[in-house]
Amino acid sequence: MVGYLVLVLNVRLNEKVCRMFNPYNVDLSQENIDVIQKNNTILLSYGIACHFDKPYHRECRGHIWHYDGISWKRFSRPYDKFWNLHESKCVLKLEEEYVLINGNKSSYEDIYLTPKEDGTCIQLYYDYEIGKWIPNTLGTLHVSNIFNVGITFQELFWKLSKEKYGISESLINETFNKDNTYLFEICADVNRIVTRYSTDRIYFVTSRNISDGHYLTSNEFSNEKPLLMTYHQITRFKVNNKNELMKLLKQYENDNDDKKFPEGFVVCANNGECIAKIKNEKYILYHGVLSGDPVFKRKQIVRLFFQNGLDDIPPEFFNEQDEAFVQRLKTYVNSLILEIEQKIQEKESKVFNTRKDYALWVTANIPSQVNGYFFQGCQGSFKDWLKERVEKNIDTYIYL
């Protein structure tokens, strides 16, 4: 191992090397941890197949490390991974009068809720290698455009900070504590997901000490406090039991003048650690339509169509191409239903001497993707039959 370390010191780090030579001294490729590398700096990000069976796996959510030629040094410490309430790995369980955190019984007094703003998380950290503060997403070390709109997240952060809050890069450099990572949420029209905000904004969410992971309270800030308080602030809510929590979640589904289609809440322990996400049902529905690539979106539209759920989606979520696809889908399905109803009547008027005669007639007269309905004796509504098989036949619809 010593020989290997000596070899690394004499070569330029790259992602392949860092999968073996990293702060945890393990083969990250075997643990489904991705390494994003830039010069001697790496960002660690869990892969979709990560089992989260090691304590440090939760840290692999955008934490940034730098190798100075002798040892690894943390550059940033954003959130650790936490899950939606319904997911099996979530550490929080809600009971009527108490909560379980990592299996330990706690009071509702030990937690609080904050709105989960529907934007892009930005970690602001000091890069000692280049000597400046860097606002970055949790997923990359490299500057990239926001959905190909011609502006990067770094540019958007500095632009909104200066124009909306009067906070310049030089002012941050003079006042912010380099021992901390500052976490923000950018919510703007150019990076909009589901929630519609009345104005572009940056929320200051929290700050974390890089060395020990401590979440700072407002009383622990120094010169940077006035600037942090200038950004949009996250509201905290306290509840006494599960019933109050669910009522709050239900109330938060409603739109207001400042925010439409809110996402839900983050549940935090009183020490500031995020332990669960609870999302509104409406948001989950809308997110399924809006997120993902065009093929995924079409699949969601098809599912909603057969569930009679398209009317529940606000019209502003559909562009012209989506609306045209919905019309083609309706036309195709309605035409198919009419055709099959006519074929059912035709079948009833015929006499088939053998099962083979019937099978030959079905094969010759019924579209292959739905002939199973006839081979099953045309039992029940044809539309219900289609609905039950929408997943199996979904490719038939999405390319209309």
Protein language model features and the residues they cover:
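Core nucleotide-handling region used for phosphoryl-transfer chemistry
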Residues: 4-400
